[in-house]
């Protein structure tokens, strides 16, 4: 039976401000991309999410990002590569301590937001993120976009790369994501998103906004936990994938 992992961004609340339903999402996904306090999240909230993930057997991933709480890590920052190495090491280390205190561990690393998109093509920042992961633990897989410069840099350093696809994001014909600033970048219809996920897994292709069929490789599918109706969307995706004969399990 073919398998696919489901991942979502969690732990992105801050104090009394909550973003999404982390507890409900942890009952659906197999991998949790947990914020590390730079783009979102605060210690008490991250501890709660990691504890809940550990109790449910959900893998914990360090979701590293730019130091940009005000912009939620969705703004490009022209950070010096040496500084970026240090910041990524810091974030992984912080979440690793929290995860270990809950009887779990950080199992992988996934960049967030603008950093994720930037290192698809930005060689210096891609190299910095890959170097930081290797410095912390060279056995940690990195989750990201196939064909990216980041994956090239990670592979050169001997890191395992795990490709993901986005069920609820629009794609360009070059295989990159449509900017969130553009209309229609984030999809909202749960049934359509679920069918799209099944189609991507079965065909290895995704339909771009211009109708182009773009080849895509994936071991994991991302379902965003902060979108309206996120729990319903994630549930529909999991149910449809299972009904189509796919086993839902973590990639690591």
From Swiss-Prot:
Pfam families: LamB_YcsF (PF03746). It comes from the Bacteria. Transmembrane segments: none annotated. One of its GO terms (biological process) is carbohydrate metabolic process. It catalyses: 5-oxo-L-proline + ATP + 2 H2O = L-glutamate + ADP + phosphate + H(+). Keywords: ATP-binding, Hydrolase, Nucleotide-binding. InterPro entries: Glyco_hydro/deAcase_b/a-brl, LamB/YcsF/PxpA-like. Belongs to the LamB/PxpA family. Catalyzes the cleavage of 5-oxoproline to form L-glutamate coupled to the hydrolysis of ATP to ADP and inorganic phosphate. Forms a complex composed of PxpA, PxpB and PxpC. This is 5-oxoprolinase subunit A. It comes from Mycobacterium marinum (strain ATCC BAA-535 / M). The gene is pxpA.
């Amino acid at each position: 039976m073919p398998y696919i992992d489901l991942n979502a961004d969690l732990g992105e609340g801050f104090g009394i401000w909550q973003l999404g339903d982390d507890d409900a999402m942890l009952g659906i996904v197999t991998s949790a991309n947990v914020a590390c306090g730079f783009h979102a999240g605060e210690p008490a909230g991250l501890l709660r999410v990691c504890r809940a993930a550990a109790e449910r057997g959900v893998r914990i991933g360090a979701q590293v990002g730019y130091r940009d709480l005000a912009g939620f890590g969705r703004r490009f920052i022209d950070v010096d590569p040496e500084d970026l190495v240090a910041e990524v090491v810091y974030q992984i280390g912080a979440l690793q301590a929290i995860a270990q205190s809950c009887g779990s561990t950080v199992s992988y690393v996934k960049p967030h937001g603008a950093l994720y998109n930037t290192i698809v093509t930005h060689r210096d920042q891609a190299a910095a993120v890959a170097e930081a992961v290797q410095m912390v633990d060279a056995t940690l897989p990195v989750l990201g976009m196939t064909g990216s410069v980041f994956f090239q840099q990670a592979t050169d350093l001997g890191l395992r790369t795990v490709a993901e696809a986005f069920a609820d994001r629009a794609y360009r014909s070059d295989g990159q994501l449509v900017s969130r600033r553009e209309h229609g970048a984030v999809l909202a219809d749960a049934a359509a998103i679920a069918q799209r996920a099944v189609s991507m897994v079965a065909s290895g292709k995704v339909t771009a906004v211009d109708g182009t069929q773009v080849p895509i490789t994936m071991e994991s599918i991302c379902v965003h936990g902060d979108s309206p109706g996120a729990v319903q969307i994630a549930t529909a995706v999991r149910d449809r994938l299972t009904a189509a004969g796919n086993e839902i399990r973590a990639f690591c």
